[in-house]
Swiss-Prot record:
GO molecular function list: metal ion binding; metallopeptidase activity
Any one biological process term the GO annotation gives: proteolysis
Species whose genome carries this gene: Chlorobium phaeobacteroides (strain DSM 266 / SMG 266 / 2430)
Keywords annotated in UniProt: Hydrolase, Metal-binding, Metalloprotease, Protease, Zinc
Organism taxonomic ancestry: Bacteria, Pseudomonadati, Chlorobiota, Chlorobiia, Chlorobiales
PANTHER family in the cross-refs: DNA REPAIR PROTEIN RADC, UPF0758 PROTEIN YEES-RELATED
NCBIfam families in the record: PRK00024.1, radc
Membrane spanning stretches: none
PROSITE patterns assigned: MPN, UPF0758
A UniProt-annotated Pfam family: UPF0758_N
Name recorded for this polypeptide: UPF0758 protein Cpha266_1761
Basic and acidic residues composition-biased segments: 1-17
Length: 223
């Protein structure tokens, strides 16, 4: 069944105009973005298939080639999907750029949706001003954290350029287990010492998982 075959009152566009976007399902909202299906694929069914395969939460991180594996999703529609989620990320980033960080929970909430590929380990450095507001968020490395990847030169280079008062390290564990490894501890200590020499405080190192986090400061591992 095509959208035009539906009762007019039940079509996504008409319901949107009548009752607002909150009344539509995720598939219906996505259908409004993609607008039309193909001769053999209802756009609602196509959007249902997308969400069933990838899940709504993961849809923002699926690459172009994988989106096109869904019947009815060509390159143009896959680009539309990625563009919508990318725009949302940038809006979220802009709103939170000078967010004040007072705890590891603040860091965890700030980083929600900012890890581009949760199947890989990423190291980010948050630059803070004297009011503990984030003035920059920089991705430094991709891959298992170790001393060669997280060299003080790379970590502090932009912090010096931005005249940051302090930094917070953030990295994710793809496994979801946020317990720090020996390498995590060693890298943190090396960077703490480097920050002390440069007079740029390392306020915390926060390891994030899917729904939890580990704070070096809260566990008294930064002295």
């Amino acid at each position: 069944m095509r959208i035009h075959d539906l009762d007019p009152e039940n079509r996504p566009r008409e319901r949107f105009l009548r009752t607002g976007p909150a009344s539509l399902s995720p598939s219906e909202l996505l259908a409004l973005v993609l607008r039309s299906g193909t001769r053999n694929n209802n756009i609602i069914d196509t959007c249902n298939a997308l969400i069933a395969r990838f899940g709504l939460e993961r849809l923002a991180d699926i690459p172009l080639s994988e989106l096109q594996e869904i019947k009815g999703i060509g390159q143009a529609k896959a680009m539309q999907i990625i563009a919508v989620f990318e725009l949302n990320k940038r809006i979220h980033y802009s709103r939170n750029l000078q967010r004040k960080v007072l705890s590891a929970r603040d860091v965890f909430e700030y980083m929600a949706g900012r890890v581009p590929d949760i199947t890989k380990e990423h190291l980010f450095v948050l630059h803070l001003n004297t009011k503990n507001q984030i003035i920059r968020n920089e991705q430094v490395t991709v891959g298992t954290l170790n001393a060669s990847l997280a060299h003080p030169r790379e970590v502090f280079k932009s912090a010096i350029r931005e005249s940051a008062h302090a930094i917070i390290l953030v990295h994710n564990h793809p496994s979801g287990d946020v317990e720090p490894s020996n390498a995590d501890r060693q890298v943190t200590e090396i960077l703490r010492q480097a920050g002390s020499f440069l007079q740029i405080d390392l306020l915390d190192h926060v390891i994030i998982g899917v729904d939890t986090w580990f704070s070096f400061r809260e566990h008294s591992l930064l002295t």
